[in-house]
């Protein structure tokens, strides 16, 4: 009680300006979790909690690396290579941030370095978030290297702008509610920024979840895989809980810190595994699947001018075994690039064009005519 009276006296004094938000005299248990050390060591419980899941996931990635490399080498899919590398990078950055936080002291320079590592980790996580949404809704049917580069360029710029803004607010205007002892804890840009960003991402992911139930599904091609919408629903719920915790903190209710602690732990520890389970597990399994599959709309025409090459089984029934064997490799449409004898060719995904048209390589045009005759 004496300590509380001293704080009240200090805030009411005309000699010292009052802080923007009063610090907590007796730290809440959810605040203690963020900075309390394990015994006499300099290792914090919070850093250890974030380190263990990232280390376990990195071990899993290394264990699956030989089979994953073999599968990627066979398919040569740029989108899977991109996601696999980004998931690896997120795990490594998360481990590096936790290790550095365990080794630095509580000086101001060390605190700034720790916050910069937090922002770097957030930058990579947000880049993957935006990449999944953009590839899924806008460019899912385009899986060439050029489209991947364009998407990554867009997400890099957006993620960098977000991280720089958040980092500037965090370093120059630290949240007084997250100051403990003689240093400031990483506060994600403050309560207000946390609230605004959480509400924004909640609305985005909620819109993605309800898109298949809206009239827009008749106008645009939407992913048909259920895992895509489960992924969006999980992130929408996570941002909703984070926003509620931020609202409580804005009203000086310290219990809101427990809510944001839980969402922060789940996001920085299990977001990369969520990406792997939702989008990469099927690809690296026994039967690879397309990352974003689309339902094809059949358009009826009276006199089609161009015919798709017939399946291999039909060609065999017509007695053209030699031509059918050569045409099977050319007729297997994929949304990824593949190697041919004359070089590298790219085929558009079936969802990106009407189902009654197709592109036939000039070298095989006569062969398709023989099959379709």
Curated annotation (Swiss-Prot):
It comes from the Eukaryota. The keyword Transmembrane applies. Its main location: membrane. This is Transmembrane protein adipocyte-associated 1. Glycans are attached at residues 11, 23, 361. Belongs to the UPF0359 family. It is found in: Membrane. Signal peptide: none annotated. Keywords: Glycoprotein, Membrane, Transmembrane, Transmembrane helix. Coiled coil: none annotated. The keyword DNA damage does not apply. GO terms for cellular component: membrane; plasma membrane. Pfam families: Tmemb_40 (PF10160). Ubiquitous, with higher levels in heart, placenta and kidney. It is a multi-pass membrane protein.
């Amino acid at each position: 009680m004496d300590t509380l009276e001293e704080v009240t006296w200090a805030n009411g004094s005309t000699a010292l300006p009052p802080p923007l938000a009063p610090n907590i005299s007796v730290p809440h248990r959810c605040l203690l979790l963020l900075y309390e050390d394990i015994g006499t060591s300099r290792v914090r419980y919070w850093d250890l909690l974030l380190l263990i899941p990232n280390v376990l996931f990195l071990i899993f990635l290394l264990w699956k690396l030989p089979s994953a490399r073999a599968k990627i080498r066979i398919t040569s899919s740029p989108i899977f290579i991109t996601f696999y590398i980004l998931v690896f990078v997120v795990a490594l950055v998360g481990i590096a941030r936790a290790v550095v936080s365990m080794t630095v002291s509580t000086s101001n320079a060390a605190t700034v370095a720790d916050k910069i590592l937090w922002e770097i980790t957030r930058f990579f996580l947000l880049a993957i978030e935006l990449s999944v949404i953009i590839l899924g809704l806008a460019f899912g049917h385009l899986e060439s290297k050029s489209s991947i580069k364009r998407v990554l360029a867009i997400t890099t710029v957006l993620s960098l702008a977000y991280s720089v803004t958040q980092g500037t607010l965090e370093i120059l205007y630290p949240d007084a509610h997250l100051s403990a002892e003689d240093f400031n804890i990483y506060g994600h840009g403050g309560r207000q920024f946390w609230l605004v960003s959480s509400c924004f991402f909640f609305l985005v992911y909620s819109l993605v979840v309800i898109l298949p139930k809206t009239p827009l599904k008749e106008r645009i091609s939407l992913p048909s895989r259920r895992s895509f919408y489960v992924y969006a629903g999980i992130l929408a719920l996570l941002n909703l809980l984070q926003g509620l915790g931020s609202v409580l903190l804005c009203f000086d209710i310290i219990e809101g810190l427990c809510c944001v602690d839980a969402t922060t732990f789940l996001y920085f520890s299990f977001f990369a595994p969520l990406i792997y389970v939702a989008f990469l597990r099927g690809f690296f399994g026994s039967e690879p699947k397309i990352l974003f599959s689309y339902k094809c709309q059949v358009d009826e025409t009276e006199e089609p001018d161009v015919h798709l090459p017939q399946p291999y089984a039909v060609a065999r029934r017509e007695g053209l075994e030699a031509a059918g064997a050569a045409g099977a490799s050319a007729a297997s449409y994929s949304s990824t690039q593949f190697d041919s004898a004359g070089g590298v060719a790219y085929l558009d995904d079936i969802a990106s064009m009407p189902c009654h048209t197709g592109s036939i390589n000039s070298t095989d045009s006569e062969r398709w005519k023989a099959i379709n005759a």
